[in-house]
Regions:
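Metallo-beta-lactamase
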Residues: 2-5, 10-12, 107-158, 164-165
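A generic local structural motif
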Residues: 5, 60-66, 88-90, 133, ...
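N-terminal amphipathic, basic-rich helices that act as targeting or association modules
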Residues: 8-10, 15-24, 28
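Divalent metal-coordination and catalytic microenvironments
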Residues: 18, 34, 44, 81-82, ...
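Hydrophobic/aromatic beta-strand patches that form the interior of the parallel beta-sheet core
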Residues: 19, 41, 78, 103, ...
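Pre-active-site segment of Zn-dependent metallo-hydrolases
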Residues: 24-29, 36-79, 91-100, 104-108, ...
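Metal-dependent phosphodiesterase/nuclease catalytic metal-binding core
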Residues: 33-38, 158-166
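Histidine-centered catalytic micro-motifs
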Residues: 77-87, 150-155
Length: 166
């Protein structure tokens, strides 16, 4: 049995907790949890491709153990762009997290839908989609307000996110 250390205390009132689930000091598996009060917003759900010394492994997904029992508090998952290191784990993790709303630009959403269908036929029908139609859109996610800004990247419809709290 793996000992992950002591459990984190509840988030104190007025405190923003940021938990990088993956993507820190590694390429891939990008996923960050933002927790404020009773609300959780997730940024990205990517896969990581295996190293040469990992035969038989197709990809590595983020460990979402921290979110167990908190599924009803997830107000949405924001996807920054459509590369697999940012959307690749969505077909596996979204269902495990109760299919929370997903937020992204149109191309990114189309890529997520396609990946869902590749994973399990008909599963894209379960997606609760919020389309960022303009970089000027503002979306309320519980106590969070999500705002967006344009970023240059090698794929269209990439966006940065600003999460505001009260």
């Amino acid at each position: 049995m793996v000992n992950n250390g002591p459990a984190l205390p509840p988030v104190a009132p007025g405190v923003l907790r940021i938990i990088p689930i993956g993507g820190c000091e590694e390429v891939g598996r990008n996923m960050t949890v933002f927790e404020y009060g009773e609300d959780i917003v997730i940024l990205d759900m990517g896969v990581q491709f295996p190293e040469e010394d990992m035969p038989g492994i197709d990809y590595v997904i983020p460990n979402i153990k921290y979110l167990a029992g908190k599924e009803r508090r997830i107000r949405g998952v924001i996807f920054s762009h459509g590369h697999l290191d940012h959307i690749g784990a969505a077909p596996i993790l979204l269902e495990k997290l109760g299919n929370p709303p997903i937020i992204a630009m149109p191309l990114t959403l189309a890529m997520i839908k396609h990946r869902q269908e590749d994973y399990q036929k008909g599963s894209s029908k379960k997606l609760k989609i919020i389309t960022v139609k303009s970089i000027d859109d503002t979306i309320a996610l519980g106590q969070f307000t999500a705002k967006f800004f344009q970023v240059e990247h090698s794929i269209m419809d990439s966006m940065g996110t600003i999460l505001e709290t009260p």
